[in-house]
Design a protein with these regions (language model features):
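Bacterial N-terminal signal peptides
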Residues: 19-30
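Blade-edge motifs of beta-propeller repeat domains
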Residues: 34-56, 88-105, 137-154, 185-202, ...
Length: 343
């Protein structure tokens, strides 16, 4: 299996070049949005930079500086061989020989954060086939110490790290297949205590944290979709590790992947998500009180399944890249200087 690396070509600002990473799954569409037939990159914007070998069945890809050298490193969750592949970056788009770490059955999701408060990035991954999630404590050199698994309910899906009780220690929210979210409160040494559980209304593969109502407490937003119910579920945090009943927004739009980004420069985290309905991406502008303006739709490629924000051209505006699983390509939503968008 391979990860495909595209690099932006910013002729006027070469120092601001960003990499767009896509996963390639043999025989099936990739979660990262690239299929077997790689599309031609848009002229003067992207070129195919490299192909990087991973483990079997890569299902998620994470970029983070694991060894604190200022270069972006990559982590791949390999579902078919129950492992993580660590790729340490050299800073020029090239990576060192991969390192493999065995984890529990069927990792499909990755997250990062400082779990034990030593200032070094750690890794968290779910074990879909083992009803747990795994914490790997980083040493700061690209190596890790795997801790005993943290037990969860059946079929853990997304892992969403954040400080939910305001004690300065990293906590985690874990979504489950059967319409549930579990809260785990960090102790500061890499272990967790089980907190409350919440109904999500439907299955969620993607979630984020943010202070959406500006009360100083961490909130959680989930992209929750199933055959009979779908919405963005917004759980407002109480600051003690508990959450209020969720507010359902963007109902019936079948959200899949969800990110936050200030898209109109007002200092508030807006929501952007891909949808399984109509091959659309949606933008929701935050009002700062936990509510959002009506969704703005952007039509794009077939099967938008993943997205990321970044500066993909030479201006200073935030753009969005969307990976399309069915049409095996990616689309760009470019923000103009006047605040409007071009798809």
């Amino acid at each position: 299996m391979y990860a495909i690396l595209y690099q932006t070509i910013a002729k006027t600002q070469p120092a601001s070049r960003l990499a767009l990473i896509c996963l390639l799954l043999i025989g099936v569409p990739a979660l990262g949005g690239c299929g077997m037939e790689l599309p031609a990159p848009p002229p003067d914007l992207f070129h195919k930079f490299n192909s990087i070998k991973t483990g079997l069945g890569p299902a998620d890809l994470l970029s983070v500086d694991l060894n604190l050298d200022g270069h972006v490193d990559l982590v791949s969750a390999n579902t078919l061989e129950n492992s993580l592949t660590i790729l340490l970056g050299k800073g020029d788009g090239v990576f060192k020989e991969p390192r493999t770490f065995k984890v529990a059955a069927e990792p499909t999701t990755l997250a990062t954060g400082d779990v034990n408060g030593d200032g070094i990035p750690d890794l968290l991954t779910n074990a879909r086939g083992a009803e747990q999630f795994t914490v790997l404590l980083g040493y700061g050199n690209g190596s890790f110490r795997k801790l005993p698994g943290v037990r969860t309910g059946k079929v853990p899906l997304a892992i969403i790290p954040g400080d939910f009780n305001g004690d300065g220690k990293l906590d985690a929210a874990v979504t489950l297949t059967f319409d549930k979210m579990e809260i785990f409160l960090g102790t500061g040494d890499g272990t967790f205590k089980k907190g409350d559980s919440y109904s999500t209304g439907s299955r969620s593969f993607s979630g984020i944290t943010g202070d959406f109502d500006r009360d100083g407490n961490a909130d959680i937003a989930l992209a929750a979709s199933s055959s009979n119910s779908s919405a963005i579920r917004l759980f407002e945090g109480n600051g003690d590790g508990t959450f209020s009943n969720p507010l359902a927004i963007a109902k019936n739009l079948v959200p899949l992947a969800l990110i936050k980004q200030d898209m109109n420069s007002d200092g508030l985290p807006d929501l952007i998500f891909t949808s399984a309905q109509g091959d659309n991406m949606y933008l929701m502008i935050a009002r700062g009180d936990g509510t959002f303006d009506k969704e703005i739709a952007f039509a794009g490629g077939g099967g938008p399944i993943a997205l990321t924000a970044g500066h993909f051209n030479s201006d200073d505006q935030v753009d969005i890249a969307v990976a399309n699983s069915r049409s095996s390509n990616f689309s760009l939503i470019v923000r103009k200087a006047d605040g409007s968008f071009h798809y």
